[in-house]
Amino acid sequence: MSNVDHAEIAKFEALAHRWWDRESEFKPLHDINPLRVNWIDERAGLAGKKVLDIGCGGGILSEAMAQRGASVTGIDMGEAPLAVARLHQLESGVAVDYRQITAEQMAEEMPGQFDVVTCLEMLEHVPDPASVIRACHRLVKPGGQVFLSTINRNPKAYLFAVIGAEYILQLLPRGTHDFRKFIRPSELGAWSREAGLEVKDIIGLTYNPLTKHYKLANDVDVNYMVQTKREA
């Protein structure tokens, strides 16, 4: 059975044409992207690395990593977001290889081929996130790094990521997130270890509605990123 939620794919298909509009529903992704790329680059040294971006969508993270000197492949199951990513490539001139394929299929095809694997803001949109993490382990080279991000599952996360972001501040379209699919750091850590990935670091991402700025912080109550490594 394919690890794809077609309703989730449809959500982003409908919005795909606005992916690179920095004032659209994708503004939060644009705003947090520099923080995420810097955090990954500081730990992995992207220049010259072969990188796979799982759930790449319209290519915001993929292009940013390519601009840091990485050789990037971006994969997604959404046809419209990938079309937008390829179209934006023509405008930006940034080289990324985009493919419509699941992480699990890619792991069968190219095991152990990547220095770095990223899977950001994607795990909470698939039926079986642990399966994606196992695929990440198969895809990354021994000694390589896997970076994951998602949203914690607790009352504060529901208040901030669903009620606050979707209903009050209207940063995201209503229905973007399903609280039941949010993932606690303990769960993400357990799935990573079971897959053969060692958790090296964790950082939170917080939003100040007054200044409208995001920053990295030790608060992992809502959004957070995890650095993991496959044994050499």
UniProtKB/Swiss-Prot annotation:
What GO biological process terms does the UniProt entry carry, in alphabetical order?
methylation
Q: What are the binding positions for S-adenosyl-L-methionine in this chain?
A: 36, 55, 76, 120
What pathway is this protein said to act in by its record?
Answer: Cofactor biosynthesis; ubiquinone biosynthesis
Q: Which GO terms describe its molecular function?
A: 2-polyprenyl-6-hydroxyphenol methylase activity; 3-demethylubiquinol 3-O-methyltransferase activity; methyltransferase activity; polyprenyldihydroxybenzoate methyltransferase activity
> What is this enzyme's class at the first EC digit?
transferase
Q: Isomerase among the record's keywords?
A: no
User: Catalytic activity, per the record?
Assistant: a 3-demethylubiquinol + S-adenosyl-L-methionine = a ubiquinol + S-adenosyl-L-homocysteine + H(+); a 3-(all-trans-polyprenyl)benzene-1,2-diol + S-adenosyl-L-methionine = a 2-methoxy-6-(all-trans-polyprenyl)phenol + S-adenosyl-L-homocysteine + H(+)
Q: What is its EC number?
A: 2.1.1.222, 2.1.1.64
Instruction: Supply the alphabetized keyword list.
Output: Methyltransferase, S-adenosyl-L-methionine, Transferase, Ubiquinone biosynthesis
- Signal peptide feature range: none
Family, according to the entry, reads as follows: Belongs to the methyltransferase superfamily. UbiG/COQ3 family.
Its annotated function is as follows: O-methyltransferase that catalyzes the 2 O-methylation steps in the ubiquinone biosynthetic pathway.
Stored NCBIfam families = UbiG
Please state what the protein is called.
Ubiquinone biosynthesis O-methyltransferase
